[in-house]
Structures are given as C-alpha cells and as structure tokens.
Amino acid sequence: MKVKPSVKPICEKCKIIKRKGKVMVICENPKHKQVQG
C-alpha cells in the first residue's frame, strides 16, 4: 500500500474507489494499491 498525495491508475486493471472519504486505487497487482493521504 502506497500513501500518495495524488493517486493515479498504473495499469488498465487499476480501479479508483472511495472508501470512508478516502480515494483509493485497488488492483490485481498488490504493488499498485494506493491510498490518498
């Protein structure tokens, strides 16, 4: 899980979602997981 000021999808399987007011990227590849904060 990477914490970044701006989250961007890395590959075509990355999905941007909102959870508890936080913007997150979830993906099949665990290295692509990101959270804004």
Swiss-Prot record:
PROSITE patterns: RIBOSOMAL_L36 (PS00828)
Keywords: Ribonucleoprotein, Ribosomal protein
This protein's record includes keyword Lipid biosynthesis: no
SUPFAM superfamilies xref list: Ribosomal protein L36
Pfam families according to UniProt: Ribosomal_L36
Recorded GO MF terms: structural constituent of ribosome
One GO CC term, this protein: ribonucleoprotein complex
Gene Ontology biological-process entries: translation
Family statement: Belongs to the bacterial ribosomal protein bL36 family.
Name this polypeptide is given: Large ribosomal subunit protein bL36
Organism taxonomic ancestry: Bacteria, Bacillati, Bacillota, Clostridia, Eubacteriales
